[in-house]
């Protein structure tokens, strides 16, 4: 569940930003470097991949190195492709946190960014270029896995860095690198 929840949480961020801000792009496409610090490990784990989000196709998260993993979520549901190549369909009715994520994204795509406040305490801090948004999960499925999420963006719909602190003590930083046009 934890591996699915974190990419899905990223979808929470990109969907409302794209839906709410008129000048935001209708699509977000980026490469990323993910650095994960785990209690008990002397060095962080680093992976590389691509992330895409658009209203028509939904959310796509692919780790390309050092292993292959894909998480996809759209109007038809969600699935993951594991490193061994097996594909698993995820049913929101059987996965409460996924149902919550899908609800937030559907509302965000209809232009309701305020729905984030139903699931998170939201604090927005203006920066010289862009803003930082701190999301602290309210009581519920997400609060069982995530302590908080901090998003730094350069412009509306353009996250540069997402920092995720997990209840297990894990910490993940995801730095986005814009894809070539």
Show the residue positions of the predicted features.
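Positively charged n-region of N-terminal signal peptides that target proteins for export
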Residues: 1-3
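N-terminal signal peptide c-region/cleavage motif recognized by signal peptidases
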Residues: 13-16
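Flexible, processing/modification-adjacent segments and terminal tails
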Residues: 20-37, 41-44, 81-138
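Short beta-strands and strand-coil junctions in structured, solvent-facing domains, enriched
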Residues: 38-39, 67-69, 141-142
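Amphipathic hydrophobic-ligand
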Residues: 43-49, 148, 170
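Extended lipid/amphipathic-ligand handling interfaces
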Residues: 49-53, 151-154
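An acidic-aromatic
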Residues: 50-103, 172
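Gly/Pro-enriched, hydrophobic low-complexity segments
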Residues: 113, 117-119, 126-181
């Amino acid at each position: 569940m934890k591996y699915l929840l974190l990419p899905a949480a990223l979808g929470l961020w990109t969907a409302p930003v794209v839906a709410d801000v008129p000048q935001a792009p209708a699509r977000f496409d980026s490469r990323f470097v993910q650095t994960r610090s785990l209690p008990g490990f002397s060095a962080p784990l680093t992976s590389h991949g691509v992330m895409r989000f658009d209203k028509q196709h939904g959310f796509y998260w692919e780790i390309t190195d050092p292993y292959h993993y894909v998480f996809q979520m759209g109007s038809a549901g969600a699935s993951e492709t594991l490193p061994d190549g097996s594909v698993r369909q995820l049913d929101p009715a059987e996965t409460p946190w996924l149902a919550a994520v899908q609800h937030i994204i559907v509302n965000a795509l209809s232009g309701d960014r305020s729905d984030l406040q139903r699931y998170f305490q939201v604090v927005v801090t203006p920066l010289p270029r862009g803003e930082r948004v701190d999301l602290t999960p309210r009581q519920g499925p997400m609060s069982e896995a995530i302590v908080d999420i901090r998003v730094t963006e350069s412009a509306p719909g353009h996250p540069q860095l997402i920092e995720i602190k997990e209840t297990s003590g894990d910490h993940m930083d995801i730095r986005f690198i814009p894809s070539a046009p």
